[in-house]
Curated annotation (Swiss-Prot):
SMART domains: H2A (SM00414). Core component of nucleosome which plays a central role in DNA double strand break (DSB) repair. Nucleosomes wrap and compact DNA into chromatin, limiting DNA accessibility to the cellular machineries which require DNA as a template. Histones thereby play a central role in transcription regulation, DNA repair, DNA replication and chromosomal stability. DNA accessibility is regulated via a complex set of post-translational modifications of histones, also called histone code, and nucleosome remodeling. Phosphorylated to form H2AS128ph (gamma-H2A) in response to DNA double-strand breaks (DSBs) generated by exogenous genotoxic agents and by stalled replication forks. Phosphorylation is dependent on the DNA damage checkpoint kinases MEC1/ATR and TEL1/ATM, spreads on either side of a detected DSB site and may mark the surrounding chromatin for recruitment of proteins required for DNA damage signaling and repair. N-acetylated by NAT4. This is Histone H2A.1.
Length: 132
């Protein structure tokens, strides 16, 4: 029997592909969709909303991990620790604004010494530098 809805006529059945794979994402679109449905954010959730939100989350995670990896490499470490995440976020203007109220456990603080606390240049040092 050719055509029709039933049976395997013509071509073999295609293997199912996840929405994450269709969108070219690593993060799970199905899980984000489930969390949106169960979170009581709205009565109805469109089909594109979880894909878009998943893409945004994946981008933010990749951006933070890239900067944290750079911070770890600057400190001659091969493993990212919370301190590296803290340094990455606080040294980036946009991420610092986005995550300004977030406390990272074991993150520490940015190294900063107020100008008034630094030692003043002595008169001898300034004279010697002017003579050269």
């Amino acid at each position: 029997m050719s055509g029709g809805k039933g049976g395997k006529a013509g071509s073999a059945a295609k293997a199912s592909q996840s929405r994450s794979a269709k969108a070219g994402l690593t993060f799970p679109v199905g899980r984000v969709h489930r969390l949106l449905r169960r979170g009581n954010y709205a009565q109805r959730i469109g089909s594109g909303a979880p894909v878009y939100l998943t893409a945004v989350l994946e981008y933010l995670a990749a951006e933070i991990l890239e900067l944290a990896g750079n911070a770890a490499r600057d400190n001659k470490k091969t493993r990212i620790i919370p301190r590296h995440l803290q340094l990455a976020i606080r040294n980036d203007d946009e991420l610092n604004k986005l995550l300004g109220n977030v406390t990272i456990a074991q993150g520490g603080v940015l190294p900063n010494i107020h100008q008034n606390l630094l030692p003043k240049k002595s008169a001898k040092a300034t004279k010697a530098s002017q003579e050269l």
